[in-house]
Amino acid sequence: MQQKCYYEILNVSKTASGVEIKRAYRKLAMEYHPDRNPGDKEAEIKFKEISEAYEILSDDSKRSRYDQFGHAGVNQQSGFGGTGGFEDIFDTFFGGGTSRGSNRSRASRGSDLEYTLEITLEEAFFGVEKEITIPRMESCDSCDGTGSKSRSKTTCHACHGQGTIRRQQGFFAFEQTCPVCNGTGYSITDPCDACYGNGKVKKQKTLKVKIPEGVDNGDRIRLQGEGDSGSNGAMNGDLYVQIIIKEHKIFERRDINLYCEMPISFTKACIGGDIKVPTLDGEVVLKVVPETQTGKVFRLREKGMKSLRGHRRGDLLCKVVVETPVNLSAEQKELLEKFADSLGEDYQSKHAPKSKTWFDNVKDYAKKFFE
């Protein structure tokens, strides 16, 4: 099956910047996250595709290999649990040395694991410690990880303990994993009842994860050695905790800045005054200047998100939305009519500059159209 283009998966061009790629990933990850689509297998598959694409394109080195060689340049290293690289490709076709192949097959590093953790914007701001439970492969206690009831192993008769066998095709000699022992170099005659000869069993592991303040959507936290157990004394894999930040009711995050819409009353917009604005670490008072219009943006410096790296802090940008009064009584309507009358016939020129400009443009356009 032909693999999908990573750029197409994220809906970005091949010249997209790192910021554009990250923004596209955040949007798609939120849309297809399994927690938002429970039981939807297609959404789960799509989320995995999005995560894989972002893993490659967010890494300059991997992205460069992908741009040069396509999926062949990154398949050995993309995803979790992948090992090896171009050296393994050459080893497959040209041997690479019996000793090196034997060591690699006998001692195998455990697979890396990924866990998606959803947190609130407040938790991303202040930092938090979360407890998670993951399924992972651990060494079988019943057989001490040997896979054998008697804890004994027999050297594989096919590869003589090497884990690989050498084959000749024309002028080429190459090594491949032994199909009899699957590269272990040994065979088991009395499989363990608990792990069925695998040497590993799946267990639930509970861990505490410290989330630093300032973490962002798509960031990954590495827990070294908390992945699947290695084989034959090899190192365990790592656990990568990928952060997803829930949508906030008030704020929208853009890098380290926060944005919000701030509704103000008709009278407050006209005459100005103080209003209380919520931030992630408490309320602040904002002075609204008289004659404020819808769309005006007030910047509250250093009231945004904390930076993950360094001591910078972003700003909070509040966009004004002037609310039109509703559910007016007869008396209130009468007062507004009197107010409108008090503005006089030259209302547009004196009191509504934007309206005057708009109507003037309409007149100019109509004049040209009908000439």
Swiss-Prot record:
GO terms for biological process, alphabetical: chaperone cofactor-dependent protein refolding; DNA replication; protein refolding; response to heat
Pfam family, one: DnaJ_C
Sequence ranges assigned to domain J in this UniProt record: 5-70
GO cellular component: cytoplasm
InterPro entries: DnaJ (IPR012724), DnaJ_C (IPR002939), DnaJ_domain (IPR001623), DnaJ_domain_CS (IPR018253), HSP40/DnaJ_pept-bd (IPR008971), HSP_DnaJ_Cys-rich_dom (IPR001305), HSP_DnaJ_Cys-rich_dom_sf (IPR036410), J_dom_sf (IPR036869)
Cofactors that this protein relies on: Zn(2+)
Annotated CXXCXGXG motif repeat ranges: 140-147, 156-163, 178-185, 192-199
Keywords: Chaperone, Cytoplasm, DNA replication, Metal-binding, Repeat, Stress response, Zinc, Zinc-finger
Any one Gene Ontology molecular-function term assigned to this protein's record: ATP binding
Co-factor binding details: Binds 2 Zn(2+) ions per monomer.
Entry binding sites for Zn(2+) 1: C140, C143, C192, C195
UniProt cross-references to NCBIfam families, sorted A to Z: DnaJ_bact (TIGR02349), PRK10767.1 (NF008035)
Domain description: The J domain is necessary and sufficient to stimulate DnaK ATPase activity. Zinc center 1 plays an important role in the autonomous, DnaK-independent chaperone activity of DnaJ. Zinc center 2 is essential for interaction with DnaK and for DnaJ activity.
Described purpose of this protein according to its UniProt entry: Participates actively in the response to hyperosmotic and heat shock by preventing the aggregation of stress-denatured proteins and by disaggregating proteins, also in an autonomous, DnaK-independent fashion. Unfolded proteins bind initially to DnaJ; upon interaction with the DnaJ-bound protein, DnaK hydrolyzes its bound ATP, resulting in the formation of a stable complex. GrpE releases ADP from DnaK; ATP binding to DnaK triggers the release of the substrate protein, thus completing the reaction cycle.
Quaternary structure, from the entry: Homodimer.
Family under the similarity heading: Belongs to the DnaJ family.
UniProt-recorded name of the protein: Chaperone protein DnaJ
Lineage: Bacteria, Pseudomonadati, Pseudomonadota, Gammaproteobacteria, Thiotrichales
